[in-house]
């Protein structure tokens, strides 16, 4: 599957931008942005999105029922394995959708399923604190400051 990359200087949310692209009949792709002004987290929480961090959403059609919990866990394991090569500290998976280092959140995943024109799409949103972190006690960690 070859995915086109849609890069933006700023969006409200990469997941919302993916939904907008799907509604323009774009079937698959990757959305990236330098910043998000209204990033989304689990259960309606806001993902604080500062410049220098990674904000990405991957979207594509899916044909059958999928277990989102298993997909989220698999994605967390993949990202954890990538970060293990960069970060000298233990990386922990905090279910349902976070990675933590030194008990501080550095990565979150938000997956959504939408239906458009009778097609089922999966959107995988990933946020990683690389350069900066929010000034929220639980999240005060970025990879560059480890």
Annotated model-derived regions:
Residues 82-117, 127:
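Acidic (Asp/Glu) carboxylate-rich active-site/surface patches
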Residues 144-146:
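Conserved small/polar residues in nucleotide/adenosyl-binding loops
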